[in-house]
Amino acid sequence: MRTLALSLFILGCHSAAPAGSEAEPDAGPPTVDGGTTCAPGLAGAPCVLDRYDRAQGCDPTAVATLRTELDARAGLGPLWAGGRALFRTAAPIGIAGDWNNWDTTALASSAFCGTDLVIAVGAVPTGLHPYKLVDGAAWSLDPLDPAFAYDDFAGNADGRNSVLDTPDSGLGHLVELDPACSTVLGNCRDVTAYLPPAYDAPENGTRTYPVLFMHDGQNVWDDHDCCFGHTGWEVNVTLDSEIANAKVAPIIVIAAASTTARNNEYGLDEPTMLQFISFQVDQLQPAALAHVRHDGGKLAIAGSSLGGLVAMELAMRHPEIYSAAASLSGAFWPRMDQHTALRDEVPGFGKQALAIYLDHGGDPSDNSDGAADTIEVRDQLVTLGWQRSDSPSCAPGPNALCYDWAPGATHDELAWKARAWRFLEFLFPAQLH
């Protein structure tokens, strides 16, 4: 199981040597207990690289100490500090990335001090660096690194590269979490997450973050090959820009992919939707949150089309879990014939302490992109006590309803990509986090 939450950075204290005694050698970067154990997780990278330097003489105790520190970080990917990166691999193999111009011979792992500990240490500058492991003609992802980036290079059969994102890159990165499986629904789905810039920096080892969950997780990142050629929402790219410009607070985004049962799970069939809602609340979310540094507050939930519908259903049914929902081009028509559509349910849900974002493209006159349906739900919410304002002049809060109409905008990922900044700035303004 990949664990991304174990990043505590506690400065160790080193007392001065007593008068008349011989001074002890420099203990290196700060440690948890004053010299024997590095700070946990990737926050301890400077200390682990110091342990590597100390083991260069192949002293068995120093090598064992290094192994212990690396074992404690198994599955977290390469460690970086001070312009150097340490990679651990299962067997000797080449490591090619953008920092060495994808040279297959520039860096390779090997047995350290004649042991079965296989590592490589090389110079890597600040930045977000894609890389692959290379064995002869075979290029592969690093199975010990959950971080990845999409790659639309035709020669990359994976469609992805592994990633080393240095804490000072100014960029966030994507990570793969454990798949989420449901015995009731009879399926599994991939779960990925966006971790904000400097998430793994030593100084942020104890920092926690607000969390946004998103539906249709395979469509929300910068995968240029997805979504009928429309590219994804590129929420990760948008967040990097919005955070850098101090418009959006650093947040974690967790996105679960939809399955072949998407339509029914997201609201077409009410019994299946209710099963999915229980799965999302009771299984998927707690499992994913265990692997990131959540601030413990209520969650936000977002989606588009049917994903926007089920986001609203989740938030309205579980205000004890969610503080906000965003529905982009929400498909609010399912179950109209049964009089159990969202518009039929909203009066019964009543006013909840939720910030809500609703938008659409198209034209209300012909209900293209669900425009008329969205306006009807918007007006119902206002009647119940939500206070409407129009993007981008929306202030967050438990009574806030932020609305946007993009006239003529189509029902696809390109349109949602163009509007994603609106709900992010509304729900996670930098000045309030």
Task: Go through the PLM ranges and name each one.
Residues D359, D363-S365, D369-R378, L384-H433:
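C-terminal catalytic histidine-bearing segment of alpha/beta-hydrolase fold enzymes
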Residues D200-P202, E265-S305:
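Gly/Ser-rich "nucleophile elbow"/oxyanion-hole loop immediately N-terminal to the catalytic nucleophile
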Residues M1, A5-P40:
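Ser/Thr-rich, Pro/Gly/Ala-heavy low-complexity intrinsically disordered linkers and tails
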Residues E203-G217:
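Short beta-strand element of the alpha/beta-hydrolase
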Residues G75-T126, V134-P167, C181-S182:
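Aromatic-rich carbohydrate-binding modules that target alpha-glucans
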Residues G296-K351:
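Primarily recognizes the serine-hydrolase "nucleophile elbow" in alpha/beta-hydrolase
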Residues V220-T231, A244-S278:
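Cap/lid segment of the alpha/beta-hydrolase catalytic domain
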Residues A157-E203:
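N-terminal cap/lid segment of alpha/beta-hydrolase-fold proteins
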